């Protein structure tokens, strides 16, 4: 699970390259015991415009990648593709994948399923478990995280904690506050000790004249999702406190006890050496003039702010 735009799909391309072509990297340093096909249910990214270049950049064997999109299925049948549809089981039987990816899960759930309902989610995922058992394949379920602040691990998965319970392994992705690096934290492993957290960044690349992106391995850390979330919370609190203190210091040292917007902004920036903290305070955008009489407003504001196409199974490739 991860927030939108973190890079789930870009890292996922590295996994697909590993499964289809046996491509090793910092992400997957040991050769796989076997390689095979990947069946990708894509609910958001277009195969021709996005996925093909991304997978080529990662080194995937495109002859072993099969993509079924929610939009294309609806265009052909007039019905949304859901996990319970027999069509999905039929596609999987023809493809014989080693790995089945559902990205994201929300795009392939029946409309009447409430993700917060444990019973409904278990029933909705039963057909997927049956496919995995019949085909002998692994399943990767991709989810967006929720918008709750200050939560990590299990609490970050959108709506349904039951998915955490059913999954044998859970990965959480996020972005570090201090240096902006992306992390992939192994939060749960039902069969062994969770592995170290992977650090990565994303490079812009060009493949066959098409601009795309590629995940680049940076190293490992023992920090987990909760550590990064706590770091973000602490740094935000420190930034707000620094901004508040700087505003009060500048105003208290002013000879007139007041200062026009541009002068106050410049003085505060010099005081705290951080324009982002001032922006997050959002105080100056609300008041054209700050005075000592407005200190209570400054305190409150600083406290509240914070400074085309898809491949058929028969073709076994993306067109």
Residue ranges and their predicted role:
Residues 93-96, 134-135, 176-319:
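C-terminal regions of RecA-like/P-loop NTPase motor modules
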Residues 114-118, 157, 237-240, 258:
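Conserved phosphate/pyrophosphate-binding and hydrolysis machinery centered on Walker-type P-loop NTPases
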Residues 32-119, 123, 130, 220-224:
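Conserved inter-motif catalytic segment of the P-loop NTP-binding fold
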Residues 5-10, 119-213, 297-301:
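Phosphate-binding/switch region of NTP-binding enzymes
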Residues 15, 87, 124-127, 246:
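Well-ordered alpha-helical segments embedded in enzymatic catalytic cores
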Residues 1-60, 172, 307-318:
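The Walker A/P-loop phosphate-binding site
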Residues 18-22, 54-58, 108, 131, ...:
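Conserved, well-folded catalytic cores of nucleic-acid-processing
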């Amino acid at each position: 699970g991860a927030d939108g735009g973190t890079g789930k799909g870009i890292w996922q391309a590295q996994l697909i390259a590993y499964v289809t072509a046996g491509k090793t990297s910092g992400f997957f340093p040991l050769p796989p015991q076997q390689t095979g096909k990947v069946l990708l249910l894509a609910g958001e990214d277009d195969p021709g415009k996005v996925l093909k270049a991304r997978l080529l950049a990662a080194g995937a064997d495109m002859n072993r990648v099969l993509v079924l999109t929610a939009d294309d299925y609806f265009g052909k049948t007039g019905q949304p593709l859901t996990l319970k549809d027999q069509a999905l089981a039929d596609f999987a039987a023809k493809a014989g994948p080693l790995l089945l990816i559902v990205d994201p899960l929300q795009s392939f759930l029946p409309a009447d399923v409430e993700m917060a309902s444990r019973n409904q989610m278990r029933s909705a995922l039963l057909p997927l478990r049956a496919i995995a058992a019949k085909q002998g394949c692994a399943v990767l379920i991709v989810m967006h995280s929720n918008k709750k602040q200050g939560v990590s691990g299990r609490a970050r998965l959108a709506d349904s904690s039951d998915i955490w319970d059913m999954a044998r392994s859970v990965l959480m992705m996020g972005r570090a506050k201090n240096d902006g690096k992306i992390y992939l934290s192994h939060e749960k492993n039902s069969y062994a000790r969770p592995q170290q957290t992977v650090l990565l960044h994303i490079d812009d690349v060009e493949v066959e004249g098409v601009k795309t992106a590629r995940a680049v391995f940076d190293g490992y850390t023992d920090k987990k999702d909760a550590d990064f979330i706590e770091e973000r919370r602490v740094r935000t609190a420190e930034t707000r406190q620094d901004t508040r203190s700087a505003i009060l210091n500048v105003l208290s040292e002013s000879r007139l006890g007041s200062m026009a917007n541009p002068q106050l902004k410049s003085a505060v920036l010099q005081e705290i050496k951080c324009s982002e903290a001032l922006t997050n305070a959002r105080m100056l955008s609300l008041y054209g003039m700050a005075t000592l009489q407005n200190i209570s407003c400054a305190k409150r504001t600083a406290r509240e702010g914070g400074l085309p196409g898809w491949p058929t199974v028969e073709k076994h490739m993306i067109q």
